[in-house]
Amino acid sequence: MPAVRSKICGITRIEDALAAVAAGADAIGLVFYAKSPRAVNVQQARAIIAALPPFVTSVGLFVNASRCELGEILDAVPLDLLQFHGDESAADCEGYHRPYIKALRVKAGDDIAAACLAYPRASGILLDTYVEGVPGGTGEAFDWSLVPQGLSKPIILAGGLTPDNVAAAIARVRPYAVDVSGGVEQGKGIKDPAKIQAFMQAVRRSNESM
């Protein structure tokens, strides 16, 4: 099995992005959703991306953004990948002609396989925890046994991951990648370098044992 990749999401500061890179993260996530405590503006995002070395993917997270708002951000910020975390349809996601991943909030009874097929051009599907009225960043894990094997898209596992549970999550789901935000923070939007290191060490150990 290929090595599981990793994304540190909710980056708001250059130093946190560099801590993620130093720990070995493959990608960093920037939240463009004003209601999130981890939201960044265009100026912050540009500065963070400018500080990244080559081959680290910058991901922009959006929640039901208007075409005008999202288009203005794309004109100003050199994002590598878009992450749609709201109720966007496949047509909505594909309208920007950029690589994208679609987040699904998982609850019992969901047909994850069918949901993957509903976004045929997605680069991957991110699975997060369903909490009513909250689009993401809940800090709560969902029941990993709900994720079937053999899905049609690469799976990015999110939702309540921490340095303590990510190894078990990888062993159970065998995802393409894992995505963490609150599990490596010392406060909302402020990352903890030691927790990032611990998370990445757990991912590496899992990769070495597979």
Swiss-Prot record:
* Reaction catalysed by this enzyme: N-(5-phospho-beta-D-ribosyl)anthranilate = 1-(2-carboxyphenylamino)-1-deoxy-D-ribulose 5-phosphate
Cross-referenced SUPFAM superfamilies, in alphabetical order?
A: Ribulose-phoshate binding barrel
Q: What is its EC number?
A: 5.3.1.24
Which molecular function GO terms apply here?
A: phosphoribosylanthranilate isomerase activity
What pathway, per the record?
Amino-acid biosynthesis; L-tryptophan biosynthesis; L-tryptophan from chorismate: step 3/5
* Keyword annotations: Amino-acid biosynthesis, Aromatic amino acid biosynthesis, Isomerase, Tryptophan biosynthesis
Q: Say if the entry is tagged with keyword Heme.
A: no
Q: Highest taxon of the source?
A: Bacteria
GO biological process terms, semicolon-separated: L-tryptophan biosynthetic process
Q: Which InterPro entries match?
A: Aldolase_TIM, PRAI_dom, RibuloseP-bd_barrel, TrpF_fam
Which PANTHER family does the protein's record reference?
A: N-(5'-PHOSPHORIBOSYL)ANTHRANILATE ISOMERASE
Q: Which family does it belong to?
A: Belongs to the TrpF family.
Name of the molecule in the record: N-(5'-phosphoribosyl)anthranilate isomerase
| Encoding gene per record | trpF
